Amino acid sequence: DNKKFVVQDANQFLKESGELFDLIVLDTYSSRHIIPLDLVTVEYFARVKARSAPDGAVVMNIVGSPSFSSPLSQKIDNTIRRVFPFPLGRQVIGSFDGWCRRGCPDRNLMYVWYNLPENSDVYTINKNSAFYD
C-alpha cells in the first residue's frame, strides 16, 4: 500500500516533495555518455538524502570505471561520499578484472546508503569493546 513509483524529473520532484521515503532507488544513468548533469551534483544528492526516512535506504546505480581510474568515476564517487559519508557500501556489478587499472570497460557501480544514526566511535588499544559490540 505504501509503494510509490514516480515518473517525472527527479530533481524537480525532490524540490517539490516534502515526503520521506523508506527506499529511494536512483537509476537514471544509461551509460557514462548519457548522464543527466544535474543528477550527479552535491545539491541533488543532498535532496535525495533529505527525503530518506529514518532507517531508510538509498540505492544508486552509477555507470563508471570499476577501478575508479577515470576522472568521471573519481569525481562522482567523491561527490556521493561528500553527501553520504557513512554508512555507504559500494559494489561493482558484473564481471570485473581487479588487475585492470586503465582502459577498463565501464560497469554498473551500485552504492547503498542507510539512514542510520551516525556513530564515529573507533576501537583503540585502550578502548576496545569489540567483544561486547
What are these regions (language model features)?
Residues D1-D77, V83:
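The AdoMet/dcAdoMet-binding core of the Class I SAM-like
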